[in-house]
Amino acid sequence: MDFPPKVVASVTSKDDAKEAIALGADVVEVRVDLVGGDGPGLVESIYYDIGCPIIVTIRPKFEGGEFDGTDAERVQLFKKLTPYADFADFELRAKNLDELLTTITGTDAVPIVSYHDFDRTPSNEEMLSIINRSVEKGAIGKLAVMPKDMTDVLRLLEITLKSKRPVCTISMGSLGQHSRLVAPVYGSLLTYGYVRRPVAPGQIRVDQLLEGLRILGLR
């Protein structure tokens, strides 16, 4: 799996999705867990009316999201939405990960298997293990971690370069904010930005991300 780094805009409304594409985003991530209303309707509306590539994310509370339904309810939601998705994001720590992965069967959706640590940056060995376990599921491995110092950010970039796997890596918060621009230099396939307000710590506005990638020769 190899393609130029894509700029992803995390959105919770159709207007956000329209603005994201106008700003130059390659993909919109619909945070169904943050929509607070008709999430499935929003995904379908973006699919039919805007026609841009979509990542469907239904992030549960145990991974920093807002979805608090049952595992079975989340599986059914994914089954309903993956036909409209280009990517579907599932958590490595989900107890029913294998069942979640079956929801893309028969669709064109590419799985993203993600791992978020909002407290620390694991050891290099742990991060490589997380990436490998994610990629072994046939997925892009997404690893988002919180740095305590700049050395943590550098370690994440080192792992990104060394992994030689299809990955998306993010060092979160203000300390790691620049990783959203430079991680693609080291091999990260996706970088996430926002349109109106950040949905994750350290996100950069989509148009600013694009300008940074142009300066770095990645656009």
From Swiss-Prot:
Q: GO BP, one example?
A: amino acid biosynthetic process
- SUBUNIT field: Homodimer.
Active-site annotation: H116 (proton donor/acceptor), K142 (schiff-base intermediate with substrate)
Instruction: Determine the domain of life of the protein's source.
Output: Archaea
**According to the UniProt record, what class of enzyme is this?**
lyase
HAMAP family reported for this sequence: AroD
Molecular-function GO terms, alphabetical? 3-dehydroquinate dehydratase activity
Q: In which pathway does it act?
A: Metabolic intermediate biosynthesis; chorismate biosynthesis; chorismate from D-erythrose 4-phosphate and phosphoenolpyruvate: step 3/7
Quote the protein name from its UniProt record.
Answer: 3-dehydroquinate dehydratase
Tell me what organism the protein belongs to: Methanocella arvoryzae (strain DSM 22066 / NBRC 105507 / MRE50)
Among the Pfam families in the record, one is DHquinase_I
Q: Record keywords: Hydrolase included?
A: no
Q: Which UniProt keywords apply?
A: Amino-acid biosynthesis, Aromatic amino acid biosynthesis, Lyase, Schiff base
The entry's 3-dehydroquinate-binding residues are: S10, E29, V30, R31, R59, R180, Q203
Q: Give the protein's function.
A: Involved in the third step of the chorismate pathway, which leads to the biosynthesis of aromatic amino acids. Catalyzes the cis-dehydration of 3-dehydroquinate (DHQ) and introduces the first double bond of the aromatic ring to yield 3-dehydroshikimate.
Classification via CDD domains: DHQase_I
Reply yes or no: does the keyword Amino-acid biosynthesis apply. Answer: yes
Q: Which family does it belong to?
A: Belongs to the type-I 3-dehydroquinase family.
